[in-house]
From Swiss-Prot:
EC number: 3.5.4.16
InterPro entries in the cross-refs: GTP-CH-I_C/QueF, GTP-CH-I_N, GTP_CycHdrlase_I, GTP_CycHdrlase_I_CS, GTP_CycHdrlase_I_dom
Any one Gene Ontology cellular component term annotated for this protein: cytoplasm
Top EC group: hydrolase
GO biological process terms held by the UniProt record: one-carbon metabolic process; tetrahydrobiopterin biosynthetic process; tetrahydrofolate biosynthetic process
Molecular function in Gene Ontology: GTP binding; GTP cyclohydrolase I activity; zinc ion binding
Reaction catalysis annotation: GTP + H2O = 7,8-dihydroneopterin 3'-triphosphate + formate + H(+)
Family per similarity comment: Belongs to the GTP cyclohydrolase I family.
Protein name: GTP cyclohydrolase 1
One Pfam entry name: GTP_cyclohydroI
Keyword Nucleotide-binding: yes
Originating species: Sinorhizobium fredii (strain NBRC 101917 / NGR234)
Pathway: Cofactor biosynthesis; 7,8-dihydroneopterin triphosphate biosynthesis; 7,8-dihydroneopterin triphosphate from GTP: step 1/1
Subunit structure: Homomer.
C-alpha cells in the first residue's frame, strides 16, 4: 500500500499544464465526438462551465494535506483515547473512467501527546477526494498523511463508497458498495484496538 501512495504523481504549475483555452477546446472536441454541435445555443458556454466545475472538483491537486494537518493541539486534560470522526461524506472520481465515486470515510487515531482539530480530518478527506482516485489509494493516502504528520499511536481509516463506473456502465450493478481499510500502529498490531474501532462504527449505525 505504501507503494500506491509514494508513486502517486502530481502535476505542478511548471510541468506543462494546459491553459484554460486549451482545456475548453478539449471539451468541444469531446462534444463533437459524442455527436453534438458545441456551437448550438445550449452548449456554447458548456466548455467554460465544465472547466470551472473541474477546477473545483479536482482542486485537491493544488492542496497539500500536510499543510492542513500542520497545526495540532496539546491534549485537553490528558485525553489519550481513541478519536473517531465517522461518516465524513465525500465525492471523488474514478481514475479509470472519470465518473463519480460517492462515499463516506471513517477516520480514527490514538493520540500520542497531540490532537487535531476535528475539521482537519474532514479537510484531509476532501483533499484526496478531489483528485482522480482509486478507493484503495485514497484510503492509504488519508492514513499516511495523518500518521506521518501527527505521529499518533495508530491510525484507522475505513471508506465505504459506491462507484458509478459499476452502476452507470459495464455490469450496471447499482447500489453495490466497496469497503476498504488501512490500519497503522496499534490499530495494525493490536487486534483489540482494531476490533474496538470496528465496534464503535457498528455502535453508531
Amino acid at each position: 500500500m505504501d507503494a500506491i501512495v509514494k508513486n502517486f504523481p502530481l502535476l505542478d504549475d511548471t510541468s506543462g499544464r494546459p491553459t484554460q483555452k486549451e482545456a475548453e477546446e478539449a471539451v468541444r472536441v469531446l462534444l463533437r465526438w459524442a455527436g453534438e454541435d458545441p456551437t448550438r445555443e445550449g452548449l456554447k458556454d458548456t466548455p467554460a462551465r465544465v472547466i470551472k466545475s473541474y477546477r473545483e472538483i479536482f482542486g485537491g491537486y493544488d492542496l497539500v494535506a500536510e499543510d492542513v494537518l500542520g497545526r495540532t493541539f496539546e491534549e485537553v486534560s490528558g485525553y489519550d483515547d481513541i478519536v473517531l470522526e465517522k461518516d465524513v461524506p465525500f465525492y471523488s472520481h474514478c481514475e479509470h473512467h472519470m465518473v463519480p465515486i460517492i462515499g463516506k470515510a471513517h477516520v480514527a487515531y490514538l493520540p500520542n501527546g497531540r490532537v487535531l482539530g476535528l475539521s482537519k480530518i474532514a479537510r484531509v478527506v476532501d483533499i484526496y477526494a478531489r483528485r482522480l482516485q482509486t478507493q484503495e489509494a485514497m484510503t492509504a493516502q488519508i492514513a499516511r498523511a495523518i500518521d506521518e504528520t501527527l505521529a499518533p499511536r495508530g491510525v484507522a481509516v475505513m471508506i465505504e463508497a459506491e462507484h458509478l463506473c459499476m452502476a452507470m456502465r459495464g455490469i450496471k450493478k447499482h447500489g453495490s458498495t466497496t469497503l476498504t481499510t488501512t490500519f497503522t500502529g496499534a490499530f495494525k498490531t493490536e487486534p483489540a484496538e482494531q476490533a474496538r474501532f470496528m465496534t464503535l462504527l457498528r455502535g453508531f449505525k
